């Protein structure tokens, strides 16, 4: 199975964009799910058009493939804070990063790798806790 890497970004207007790292495919939508679905539809449309017109297309489109998504920290924070799932205070408790700094990340400041790792670690810890409760 071919693995396709895609990047998720949230625009300032609240919409989402998904684009493949090494392929030509992308998608956009008002929600993250809509952007992912738009990219999948574009991949299907590309293949259908290529077949109908006799053009070459990436071989992985004929078989099974998996899309692996990566999200930038600002988009990740915006998604969960914007949806009301987390507050900045809650993220501060999970990550140890103060709310003012998290707010800066939410508004476009790119966190250093160490700060990104702290955010990821905090979210993974929450995931582990939830998995242990509901396993």
Give the residues covered by each predicted segment:
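Short, charged, surface-exposed hinge/linker loops at domain edges
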Residues: 1-3, 38-100, 104-105, 109-114, ...
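DNA-contacting interfaces and partner/effector-binding or oligomerization modules
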Residues: 1-54
């Amino acid at each position: 199975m071919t693995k396709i890497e895609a990047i998720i970004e949230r625009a300032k207007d609240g919409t989402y964009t998904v684009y493949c790292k090494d392929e030509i495919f992308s998608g956009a939508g008002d929600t993250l799910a809509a952007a992912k679905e738009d990219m999948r539809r574009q991949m299907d449309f590309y293949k259908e058009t290529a077949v109908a017109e006799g053009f070459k297309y990436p071989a992985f489109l004929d078989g099974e493939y998996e899309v692996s998504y990566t999200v930038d920290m600002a988009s990740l924070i915006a998604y969960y804070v914007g949806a009301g799932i987390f507050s900045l205070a809650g993220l501060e408790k999970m990550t140890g990063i103060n709310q003012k700094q998290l707010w800066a990340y939410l508004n476009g400041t790119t966190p250093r790798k160490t700060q990104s790792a702290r955010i990821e670690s905090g979210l993974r810890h929450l995931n582990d806790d939830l998995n242990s409760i509901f396993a």
